[in-house]
């Protein structure tokens, strides 16, 4: 009974993080979803591609349930699972993610939390579905957080889900940012702290 509750809870949280990640693409042009937004080249559509590949591998291959399509190379020298070629469309990548999630969902539904798996690239490769599900949830949530920050840097939009988004008060945000900046400068002695 507790296993069913735990599985349902983890799966629901995973679905929320998946939705948040994909939502970060909404309303952006092709350039903004693809361009590198960090010094390491992190980009919004690449995060979705990376998570699609991760779900297909961790909640597919690891449990002897290979994804039925070819997958991008995994952690290769050029990071091909982290960025999108000019020939790959937004729709293709989002559809790939949805198919990978559906495949992963079947694994979650059909296997018990103590189902054994094998992650050959981990130091302790013998795993259970519970541990892998926690890992996938953690990784998806982390990347959804990356996407949230990247999106905020592009157009100021923040939040977890579209239905919870509130219009931005740009004046209040600017005032808050100025206070934080002033405090940071005061901390290093560059300006006196305001009280």
Residue ranges and their predicted role:
Residues 2-3, 80-92, 121-130:
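Acidic/His metal-coordination segments adjacent to aromatic residues that form catalytic metal sites
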Residues 7, 11-25, 30-78, 119-186, ...:
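Short, contiguous alpha-helical
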Residues 22, 26, 105, 109-112:
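Amphipathic, well-packed alpha-helical segments that form the structural scaffold of globular domains
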Residues 67-105:
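Helix-adjacent hinge/juxtasegments
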Residues 91-110, 182-195:
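Long, charge-rich low-complexity segments
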């Amino acid at each position: 009974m507790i296993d069913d509750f735990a599985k349902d809870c983890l799966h629901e949280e995973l679905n929320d993080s998946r939705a948040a990640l994909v939502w970060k693409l909404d309303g952006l042009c092709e350039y903004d979803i693809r361009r590198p937004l960090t010094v390491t080249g992190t980009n919004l559509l690449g995060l979705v591609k990376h998570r699609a590949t991760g779900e297909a591998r961790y909640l597919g291959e690891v449990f002897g349930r290979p994804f039925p399509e070819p997958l991008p190379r995994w952690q290769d020298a050029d990071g091909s699972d982290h960025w999108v070629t000019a020939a790959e469309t937004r729709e293709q990548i989002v559809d790939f993610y949805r198919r990978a999630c559906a495949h992963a969902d079947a694994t979650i539904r059909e296997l018990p939390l103590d189902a054994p798996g094998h992650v050959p690239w981990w130091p302790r490769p013998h795993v259970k579905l519970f541990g892998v599900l926690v890992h996938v949830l953690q990784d998806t949530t982390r990347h959804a957080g990356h996407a949230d920050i990247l999106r905020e840097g592009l157009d100021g939009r923040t939040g977890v889900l579209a239905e919870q988004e509130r219009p931005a008060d740009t004046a209040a945000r600017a005032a808050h940012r100025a206070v934080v900046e002033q405090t940071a400068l005061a901390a290093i002695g560059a300006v006196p702290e305001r009280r």
